[in-house]
Amino acid sequence: LSYAAQIATHRGLRNLASLSGTLLSVKSSPELCLALMILEANAICYPDNVYEFPIQPIDLNPDSIITEIRIPIQSVNTSLERVSRTPLDKSIVCSAVALIIQEDNITDIRIAISGISEQPIAIQTIDSSIVNLSISKMKSMIYEAIKDSADHKYSDYLGSAEYRIEIATILTVRAIKKSLSKQ
């Protein structure tokens, strides 16, 4: 979460901005949202309800305000990998991974990716046993899961849909490896 906050914007703007404003801005960097998605955080809004990430500003009451972000206590190893034109540019593709650990065993894996569709998405079809596979099998399974979840029409001058899916796969494998090394 701290790394995501550091790369979301430069120090001057971080000192002025609020987390809720950053999360609701369409043009903001996706790293914070991805970090909160893999940590299964909720946004508490007054006077509305509890929202999961990513928050869709269109769903919010215009009179509501995010009053708190709740992150459940959990034992996780997290990692965030990204590709951008420069270190402070908005990510072209970004992948966040959380390995949930109970009694020294990986019990679940959470993956969230931005840059393969209009909004950041959580990849639901990956099983925690993937960490025990060879790298080539892991990459193949992740590629298929991302391909199934991606918006195949989502492309722009920064990358085609195919490029974004391939990069998301590479970044996700890197993030899993980095999370495993923290164990």
Where are these regions (language model features)?
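C-terminal structural segment of proteins
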Residues: 1-183
